[in-house]
Amino acid sequence: MNEREFLNLVAKESSFLIAAHEMKTPLSIIRQLSLTLNDDDTEISDDERSRILRQIDITSERALRLVQDLTKISKLEDAMFELEPINSKKICCDVVSEISDVFKLHNRVIRFKNVRKNELIVANYELLRSVLMNFSDNALYSSNEKTEVEIKVSNVGEKVRISVRDFGDELPLSIWRAVKKQNHQPVQASSRPQSSGLGIFIAQSFATAMGAKIGVIRHRNGSTFYIDLNRSGQLSLL
């Protein structure tokens, strides 16, 4: 085994360990909530029981989504993910609709900043949806309670940018540097034990497969993750 093969093996093992760490969090939450429901010594109201069951459901969906994204990554080289014109406003609204319940459960709000013009972009719907879901998931755990996370579409030169802005803790330098260097490996951040950066790694991999590029802007009161996509020459009729 030469040095390059050894380094690749170490990188793959590191990615596996970080992925396992990311999976551990939702599974631990599900286990703890299940124990609470089954504890005969703990009195739980009907409303609290409904809330716990909803949290188990949402947490399970997050874990399943993570597994599905990792499966897609393993097939990126072999599978053909077709690129097509996609309405940027529609996919943003779809993501907000899908993840809003998760934000409500954590006393947070996510909204789409409406735009007059519907930009058509060239992308794969499922891959782009996963990118935006991972950006939103990252924003959920880094934003402060009772703050709004905002998804926005804007024009940047010849590209269309979809960004997710959160208001909370400053982005760890380890994740910021990894994105800036286009480092296609998950990065663990000690200041965010609940988020290993695996979602950003997934977003980066999917963006590359679509010929797009992700980036991040650090703010004193949060961060903005974005993806720059090619604009479609086809006119939007919506």
Regions found by a protein language model. Give the residues of each.
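Short conserved segment of the HATPase_c
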Residues: 171-185
